[in-house]
Amino acid sequence: MSLNLTDAADDRSYKEMEKYTVERVAGQGTFGTVQLARDKSTGSLVAIKKVIQDPRFKNRELQIMQHLARLRHPNIVMLKNYFYTVGGEGRRNDVYLNVVMEFVPETLHRTCRNYYRRMTNPPLILVKVFMFQLLRSIACLHIPVINICHRDIKPHNVLVDEQTGELKLCDFGSAKRLAADEPNVAYICSRYYRAPELIFGNQFYTTAVDIWSVGCIFAEMLLGEPIFCGENTSGQLREIVKILGKPTKEELHKLNGSSTEINANAKATPWENVFKQPLPAEVYDLCGKIFKYVPDQRITPLDALCHPFFNELREPTTKLPSGNPLPAHLYQFTPDEVEAMTEAQREYLLKK
C-alpha cells in the first residue's frame, strides 16, 4: 500500500519528536541507527530506532510492533511511540521512521561476551532465566491467532538486564505473519542461527525456524561460541551435520533438500561430547529435543517451558547471581498464552 511519507512527517510527528532529548547513538547497522533518548515528561530513558522508509510501502515492522504492543507481553520489547522525520545524514528528501521503544540496558550478545572475555560462561541459573523468557517470547509470537515468525533471533536482538534478570525480544525488521499456502523468502536469519530448512532454500517454512535459533543461543551461552559456525551456507550445513549426523532420506525429503554436499559417513555427536565441560543431563535432553532436522519434530516453545531444565526456577529460594530475586513475571502468563496451552501445559505451568 502506498503511503505519502512526506505528508506523514507532519506537525504531529514534529510534536512527537520534541518529546525526546537524544543523548547518544547506542547502535548502528545496515538497518539504520538506534539512539538513546530521554522522555522529557517522565525523565525515563527510551530507545529510538531510526530507519529509512520506502515510500511505496507501509512499514511491516511498525505494524507488527503495534499489534504486539496490544498484547503487553513482558518478554517482547514495548512500542511506546513512533514518528516520521525528513532528511538527515546528507539525504535531504529521505523520510525516516523513528520507532520509540522501552529502554533495556544491554543485549544478550554483549552480556555473554563480557563472560567469554573472562574465559568463563554465564552462570547456569542466568541461562535458565534468560532461556525461559526467550521461549516465552516466541511462544507468544507463535500462538496460532498471531502466527508471527521473528526470522532473525540472535543474541544481538535479545535485550537483557543482568541485575534484574529481565529479557525482551526486539528487532522485528524481519518478522512476518506466516500463511501456510504462501511462499516466503528463504534467505533470512543470520547464518549461525539459520534452521536447516532455510539453508536448503525451502520457502514454505513454519515458525519452527525460531525455535532452532533459540536453541542456537542456548548452546552458545553454554559453549562460549556459536554451536554451528560455518563460513558460508554450505559450511553452515556441514557444521550442523557434524553434530546431528547425516539426515535420513525422509528428513531430506521433508526439508526439500539434497545430499550432494553432505558427508555420507557423518554420524551424530553425543551431546556430552559437544560441550567443553560436563553439564546437567537436562541440558543434553533439551538440545536433543530442539535440534531436529524436521521442523515439526522440534519441541514447541510451550512444551520447552515445561522441560525439567527449568525446574530450579520454580523454587521460591532461587536467586539471580546478583542476589536479586527472579523476575516476578516469570510464571505470570497472559490470557493469550493460557488460551494457547494444552491442558497438561496449564496444569504444569500455572500450578506454581
Swiss-Prot record:
Keyword Kinase: yes
Bridged cysteine pairs (disulfide): none
Catalysed reactions, as listed in the record: L-seryl-[tau protein] + ATP = O-phospho-L-seryl-[tau protein] + ADP + H(+); L-threonyl-[tau protein] + ATP = O-phospho-L-threonyl-[tau protein] + ADP + H(+)
Top-level taxon in the UniProt lineage: Eukaryota
Enzyme class: transferase
Binding site for ATP: A26, G27, Q28, G29, T30, F31, G32, T33, V34, K49
The keyword Transferase is assigned to this record: yes
Family matches, as InterPro entries: GSK-3, Kinase-like_dom_sf, Prot_kinase_dom, Ser/Thr_kinase_AS, STKc_GSK3
UniProt xrefs under SUPFAM superfamilies: Protein kinase-like (PK-like)
UniProt GO BP: cell differentiation; mitotic cell cycle; mitotic cytokinesis; protein phosphorylation; signal transduction
Residues annotated as the enzyme's active site: D152 (proton acceptor)
Pfam families xref list: Pkinase (PF00069)
Subunit structure and binding partners: Inhibited by cyclin kinase 2 (CDK2) inhibitors, including GW8510.
Protein known as: Glycogen synthase kinase 3
Organism: Trypanosoma brucei brucei (strain 927/4 GUTat10.1)
Gene (name only): GSK3
